[in-house]
Amino acid sequence: MINTVKEFDTKEWVKVRSSLDGNQTFLSWTGSIYSFVPGEKKKRLFNIVGMSVSRCIANDDESWDFTSRELTYYLDPETGEILHKWENPWTGETVTVVHVANSPVEGHFKGKFPGQVNGEITTFVFDLFPTYPNSLATEERFKDYSPQETYQAAELFKLTVPTKELENLDTVTVSQMFIAWDRIGPWLPWMKMGDKAGNLIYSACGLKVKDFSELPQLLQDEINSRVPLYKNAPKSPLDDDMTSWTYFKKHFEAYLAGERFPIPEAEE
């Protein structure tokens, strides 16, 4: 069957990504990260496991504010254990691993959202290509970590949900949502790759889970013991988005000192 493209209202999209009633919702994902270097065979560098807790807040103009927090941990691809130190296979240097701890990650939803309807399922496709000045490139202290003047990546998302729940006016959120996420991005600053040619390829998938207790146990343990801030989404929009690059800059001294990441963050 050929997919039919339908324009969905903002409220229907909010049901996919979070919930209409202001309650928070959780996503979880797993995957792998590979090196992609000209003239070299790929290397599977890491497995990953991650989560997001999000909330949508209605505005008077029928738009919605989206606010969230997200974690992703880099795992040993053989053992599945959390990596705190990593031996760089190109330089031989052992570096501190800086896991993803982004708070907040925010957005603003309005207008129509095209979905590919295929009978019982509907898929939303978002191909994003963020390109902007690299804030680390302006400082000499980061030249061995991220010297490129421009940050450039590709983020490819596919979110699939039950069509009936999407269109049902009585539901505030879909009970099932499956996400596929692929990414092409630069070396992470903590890898200390300097100006070496190449990229990272991410291949991951995940789903919406009912609550915190359905997250992978590794994430529950880390959040409970180290970063309880990530048990809950913000109750209202916060400041500028946190990214892996701004987080690295903020905690650069802790990285140099070999501290364990993510840096502890207390519950609000």
Report residues per predicted region.
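Acidic, low-complexity intrinsically disordered regions
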Residues: 9, 25, 60, 82, ...
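Predominantly extracellular/secreted and cell-surface proteins with exposed
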Residues: 39-168
